[in-house]
Amino acid sequence: MRFAAIADVHGNHLALEAVLADIRAQGVTEIVDLGDMASGPLDARKSLDRLMALDAVHVRGNHDRWLIDRPFEKMGAWERPAYPQLDAGHLDWLRTIPATAVYRDKVFLCHATPEDDNVYWLESVAPDGAITCAPLDEIEKLAAGISQSLILCGHTHTARAVRLSDGRLIVNPGSVGSPGYSYNVPHPHVVQAGSPDARYAILELTPAGWSVSFRHVPYDNSAMAELARANGDNEFASALATGWIR
């Protein structure tokens, strides 16, 4: 069993195309998508058209949910540029995407955590903004009741693998389309990948257990940085250009 996991495309269709090409080059034919597909100051329509055409298993992210359950005037800074690009078909499709899924009986999929699509699972944020791996006992509490040996999540745009004490593995593949952002919950903090590459992971079930290969894929990130800047989001543009926002 071998497949690719993508997450957090955020409307970056050039990064998505580069990742899909790399997946094909690796001989992988199966894909799961962990959500946050379209929101951002980029090209929501092209990204969602491409994802809708994929033979993939999708779960919905918090930004996907906000596109379909909030009136426009209450949408956030990443939804407002994306929403006008989408038509009824895109939004209806997003409504069909579940919050969680099980892939081939062996893999549990969610965007952030099994119960909440907008909290961090594998990371903790200190009052001073420092980000560290969350304590194992806190991670394991949120994994209670999940029987699958592999658990996949996204949301934090941070590639990471955590082995639980019972042998299960939780993996975040990193973000395809957004290598950095700032956020104020639970405390003001900044996530920065340090390079502008598109990220995803290849998972393989071997006789010894799950193998994880984190992939960093270069693409025309400068073009997407220019688009973000043209759409008025200098922070997103900086992340796309360099992998850093400050």
Stretches found by the model and what they are:
Residues S47-L109, E115-S147:
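Active-site neighborhood of divalent metal-dependent phosphoester bond hydrolases
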Residues I6-A7, I31-D36, G40, V57-N62, ...:
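Active-site neighborhood of phospho(di)ester-bond hydrolases with catalytic His/Asp-centered motifs
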Residues C133-L164, R168-P173, Y183:
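Anionic-ligand binding region
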Residues R163-R246:
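Acidic, His/Gly-rich catalytic cores of divalent-metal-dependent hydrolytic chemistry
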Residues M1-A4, V102-L109, L164-R168, A208-W210:
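Beta-strand-turn-beta hairpins that frame and shape the catalytic cleft
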Residues H10-A15, S39-L42, D64-D69, V102, ...:
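Active-site environment of divalent metal-dependent phosphoester hydrolases
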Residues M1-A56:
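N-terminal active-site segment of His-dependent metallophosphoesterases
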Residues I23-V28, Y103, A144-S147, I202, ...:
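Glycine-rich phosphate-binding loop signature in dinucleotide/nucleotide-binding domains
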